[in-house]
Each structure stands twice: as C-alpha cells, then as structure tokens.
C-alpha cells in the first residue's frame, strides 16, 4: 500500500501527481495485454490459442470465486473464530484467490498469439505477479497473518506453497 488514504495525498502536489501517474501507468500496461489480444491477426475466428486462453480464463475466474467462497464459508462458521483456513484450495496455496486472479491476466498472452504486439500481452501477467507477490496483496496479507496468528501461521507457511498451487510440503512435525 503506497498511500494510506486519498486525504493524505490530495494536499501535496507531488504525492497527488505520483498517485495519478502510477495509476495511469498501471492501466496503460495492463490494458496493453488486452490491446495485443484485440489486434491479433489470426485468420481463424476462434483458433486453438483462443480456445485454450478462453478455457483458462473461465477456469481461473470460477476457481477464484470458489476460493473466495471457501474462505467466506469458513469465516462464517463460529467454530473457526480466530483460525485461518487450511482446507480446500487453501491447502494447496496460501493465496489461491491471488493465483487465479493472476491466471486471468496470463490468458491474454494466449489470446494475443498472432498479433504483431503479442509481446505486450506479457505486461499484464508480469505486472500483476510483481504487484501481488511483492508490492501489495501477499506481503500485506502475510504480515497481518503472522502478527495475528504467529507460530501457527509460520507452520502453514512452511507446509503450504505461497502462490502457485501445489501439494503441501511435509514439515518436521508431519509423519511420512
């Protein structure tokens, strides 16, 4: 989180300019992925890359919804107060919702095949990964979880992949 609130930046021209410039750059680079896909010169109305990209997009969208729903249902259960979810998609990744959001951006690379600007399609997934992994989503969430859940969350970190879903790793406490 670069700025805590709009009130903090609107009174300082430099902060205001920085915030709006960063937002403009973000929109430009992420929209470039869609632009590259839209300008594709593929002759087929719906080729294999478009099919794979569309299926991946739909899968990512639906699984992101499933991850959010799993977490919401977990939090609604009074027995889970003070706990964090380790089941379902959350047993495969500490941030499955972020991963499947990122997958959405990756599909534009496939949809852009055939465009002279196909390489621009990489800007969306690369920027989204950097922002989610290093600047906004994951660092903030992990820091907050460590603060509120301590060693229990550290154990979860050791046993569960951070971003890319995979099988849980064995820790010293887990029997073979």
Give the location of each predicted region:
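Hydrophobic transmembrane alpha-helices
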Residues: 1, 27-70, 74-176
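Juxtamembrane helix-capping/reentrant segments at transmembrane boundaries
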Residues: 3-18, 83-90
